[in-house]
């Protein structure tokens, strides 16, 4: 009886927090549902670290890639948005987790309670749930990064503002409730998100027992979804995609580059620190930029400095106004800090954001359902190609994007 009361209380609570979309429209009958789930920070080789029976089940009768290559920078919000827009960060607008925009004269930052992260004005490309809604189908999202923002005047039919107190099990149960809806109320696209593996990787490092436990825990939650679909007799009638935004690499306190050992930072604004440091020079004088660039260019063998339009071509960062005058970038495992910000007692054991050429930054793509082949392992692919694939699976017309639909056809049923 007590358990029944608790479940009812949760259902009432979560229903009250369930928000409806901002546009009134007539909806069409739904197509085959697609469920998209992100396991933040799940590195491509984590399948080999510990037991993942539920993910293994999806792979055995579905598909996976050898790895999912993130866009630069391999950070959480830029890559979640790259996955759902098919666009490089330069084009979709989120070039980092923390940014400054001179036109807005505002800072963008992430975290529970961030108002900027829920403001769609920062986003310049159409996410998949907007594409779905614009074609008179329903999208419903639970905690996918940026899905609680109104973007281009559109929200999912149902969505949740991020609340870390809502357990992973409750998230899966919500997806199952949504998919039980009938007729035109039923969603064609559903999405959710797990942070556990990323959290453990940061705190303990990628190759630790704590991270392995987080992997097993999230796999268990995937099992709740699988079994819930089986109980409803629709497991093989639903397309499922499991992805991650990036991987994870080890960080060490003896692999820190102190920026203030090489330049005077007293008149500079460091927008962020860690894997890379965007440097804002208030007056943007070319002479100041050139002088700082010269001081940093060969300052440390594991640190690289780029002017606003001087990034490697593979980074696909060119003309976005949120890119600062200079950006210093660390090699794999290294961090760039100031002496003031360095705290060995609060130092991450793992991090991401590095050049996607490092395999440690690669994530996962797993697909299962009537739209995918069975028992197929394919090549590594860039995450910008998934948007076109999702559109094809749902039989909808994609918006403008940077992806190539031919890249992912190898994973799909003929």
Each PLM stretch: what is its role?
Residues 19-64:
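Active-site-proximal N-terminal segment of extracellular/periplasmic enzymes that hydrolyze or transfer
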Residues 47-92:
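Short, structured active-site-proximal loop/turn typified by the sulfatase FGly-forming signature C/S-X-P-X-R
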Residues 272-377, 381-389:
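Active-site neighborhoods of enzymes that stabilize oxyanions during catalysis
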């Amino acid at each position: 009886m007590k358990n029944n009361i608790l479940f009812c209380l949760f259902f009432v609570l979560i229903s009250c927090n369930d928000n409806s979309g901002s546009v009134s429209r007539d909806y069409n009958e739904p197509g085959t549902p697609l469920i998209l789930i992100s396991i933040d920070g799940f590195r491509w080789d984590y399948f080999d670290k510990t037991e993942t029976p539920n993910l293994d089940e999806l792979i055995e009768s579905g598909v996976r890639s050898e790895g999912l290559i993130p866009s630069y920078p391999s950070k959480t919000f830029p890559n979640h948005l790259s996955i759902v827009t098919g666009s490089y960060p330069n084009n979709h607008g989120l070039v980092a987790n923390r940014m400054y925009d001179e036109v807005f004269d505002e800072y963008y930052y992430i975290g529970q309670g961030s108002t900027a992260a829920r403001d769609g004005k920062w986003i310049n490309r159409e996410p998949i749930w907007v594409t779905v809604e614009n074609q008179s189908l329903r999208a419903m999202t639970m905690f996918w990064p940026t899905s609680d923002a109104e973007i281009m005047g559109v929200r999912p039919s149902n969505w949740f503002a991020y609340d870390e107190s809502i357990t992973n099990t409750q998230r899966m149960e919500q997806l199952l409730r949504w998919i039980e809806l009938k007729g035109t109320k039923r969603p064609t696209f559903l999405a959710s998100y797990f942070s556990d593996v990323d959290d453990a990787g940061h705190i303990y490092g990628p190759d630790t027992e704590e991270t392995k436990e987080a992997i097993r825990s999230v796999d268990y939650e995937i099992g709740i979804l699988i079994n819930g679909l089986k109980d409803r007799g629709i497991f093989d009638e639903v397309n499922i995609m499991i992805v991650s935004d990036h991987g994870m690499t080890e960080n060490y306190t003896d692999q820190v580059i102190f920026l203030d050992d090489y330049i005077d930072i007293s008149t500079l604004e460091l927008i962020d620190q860690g894997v890379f440091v965007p440097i804002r020079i208030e007056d943007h004088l070319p002479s100041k930029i050139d002088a700082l660039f010269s001081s940093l260019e060969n300052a440390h063998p594991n640190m690289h400095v780029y002017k606003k339009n001087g990034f490697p071509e593979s980074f696909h960062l060119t003309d976005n106004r949120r890119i600062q005058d200079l950006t210093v970038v660390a090699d794999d495992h290294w961090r760039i800090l100031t002496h003031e910000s360095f705290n060995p007692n609060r130092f991450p054991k793992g991090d991401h954001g590095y050049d996607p050429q490092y395999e440690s930054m690669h994530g996962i793509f797993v697909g299962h359902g009537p739209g995918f082949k069975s028992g197929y392992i394919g090549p590594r692919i860039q995450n910008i190609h998934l948007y076109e694939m999702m559109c094809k699976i749902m039989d909808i017309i994609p918006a403008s994007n940077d992806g190539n639909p031919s890249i992912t056809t190898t994973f799909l049923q003929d």
